[in-house]
């Protein structure tokens, strides 16, 4: 009897291992799960080549593939995540913090509301004040140089923080009042020094008290239809700084859709089933008014993911002629076609000097990090006459299509990027003009 049981267990073990192997390699059992959103990383099946074997990349790709595709790994992980969320209202994604009534928040935003996020960055209230005050001083210095020497406007806005707009759904947590909220200090110093800034968090909090529609979806932390109010105010504010003549947005109404609103953050929880969503989707009916007296500006946005609503919901091509998005001062997206670069792959000063407005923004809790290094880098570059000369020459060359065609051909011949070739030619022209 014992031998018979052992044989059965042995056969079942072999069959189970074969099932895992087949599922890993061929995946015959397709499990329908909620699609992941935001920024998932693919782990493609590796292809064995002599070059990839020789340089070790095949081994690395194989390990990544097996790590992500081993048998029923995804189903197992999602099942555990669903168990934690359904029974205990907990998530296995440390960035998210479940609130009451199926509301979801970013954990740093919740900590910021309770005064605890700043403790990760500063040792005391005085330390935080010194940091913020220095950041504001640098922004004012950069603004003065850009405005006086180049006619470029620099401004900021603090994007609305869901935790401060709808605190009634937050989880309970102890307040820490030793250091304070950096975004509030930034707002205060901007006002005291006269730096142009819009604090959208306090504005949206006031709007939420009277609005019959939710300004944020319960399971999403980004603005949707409400972004129309934010960007309308932003562009009106920009135009008021210098009378540029920016076309005017007109919000003709808010329409309710017959389906639930987007809840992109839900997909990052990696659950098996959708979370209950009774909140309808809303869309803003937006038109842009323009005549012969209006001009469409060039704009550089330096900030976070609150720009996505501008790219998907606002008729931006009717408002502006060109824009760049410096996403977390890491990735760069140029133009309406969103040509992608790393921040270190471009001449940042020439981008700054090639626009009419520079808009630095971020949601409230992220002001703990100031401008993520933007203002320090920009000040250092703009105070260097040689860097300014090269940047201006690059922009001058780029404005001439026939020269840019030559740049593209030379870049292809030399095996460098167009940006690198453009900078090399700008330096060559400057050196020859000085001879």
Can you say where each PLM-predicted feature lies in the sequence?
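Extracellular glycan-modifying ectodomains
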Residues: 1-435
């Amino acid at each position: 009897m014992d031998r018979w049981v052992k044989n059965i267990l042995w056969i079942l073990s072999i069959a189970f291992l074969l099932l895992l192997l087949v599922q890993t390699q061929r995946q015959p059992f397709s499990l329908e799960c909620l699609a992941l959103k935001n920024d998932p990383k693919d782990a493609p099946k590796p292809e064995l080549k002599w070059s990839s074997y020789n340089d070790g990349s095949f081994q690395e790709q194989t390990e990544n593939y097996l790590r992500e595709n081993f048998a029923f790994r995804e189903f197992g992980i999602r099942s555990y995540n669903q168990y934690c969320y359904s029974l205990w209202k907990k998530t296995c994604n440390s960035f998210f913090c479940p609130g009451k009534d199926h509301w979801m928040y970013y954990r740093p935003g919740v900590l910021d509301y309770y005064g605890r996020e700043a403790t990760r960055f500063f040792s005391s209230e005085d330390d935080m004040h010194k940091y913020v005050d220095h950041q504001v001083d640098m922004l004012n210095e950069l603004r003065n140089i850009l405005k006086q020497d180049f006619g470029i406007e620099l401004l900021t806005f603090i994007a609305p923080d869901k935790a401060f707009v709808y605190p009634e759904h937050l989880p309970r947590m102890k307040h820490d009042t030793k250091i304070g909220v950096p975004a509030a200090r930034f707002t205060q110093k901007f006002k005291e020094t006269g730096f142009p800034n819009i604090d959208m968090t306090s504005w949206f909090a006031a709007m939420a008290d009277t609005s019959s529609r939710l300004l944020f979806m319960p399971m999403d932390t980004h603005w949707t239809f409400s972004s129309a109010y934010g960007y309308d105010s932003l562009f009106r504010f920009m135009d008021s700084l210098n009378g540029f003549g920016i076309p005017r947005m007109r919000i003709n109404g808010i329409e309710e859709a017959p389906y639930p609103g987007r809840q992109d953050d839900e997909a990052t929880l990696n659950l098996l089933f959708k979370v209950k969503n009774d909140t309808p989707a809303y869309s803003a009916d937006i038109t842009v008014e323009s005549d012969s007296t209006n001009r469409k500006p060039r704009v550089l946005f330096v900030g976070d993911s609150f720009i996505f609503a501008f790219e998907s919901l606002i008729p931006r091509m009717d408002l502006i002629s060109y824009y760049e998005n410096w996403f977390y001062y890491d990735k760069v997206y140029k133009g309406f076609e969103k040509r992608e670069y790393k921040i270190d792959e471009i001449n940042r000063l020439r981008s700054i000097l090639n626009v009419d407005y520079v808009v630095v923004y971020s949601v409230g809790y992220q002001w703990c990090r100031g401008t993520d290094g933007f203002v320090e880098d920009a000040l250092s570059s703009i105070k260097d006459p040689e860097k300014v000369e090269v940047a201006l020459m690059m922009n001058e060359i780029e404005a001439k299509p026939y020269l840019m065609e030559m740049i593209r051909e030379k870049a292809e011949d030399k095996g460098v990027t167009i940006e690198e070739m453009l900078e090399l030619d700008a330096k060559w022209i400057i050196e020859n003009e000085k001879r």
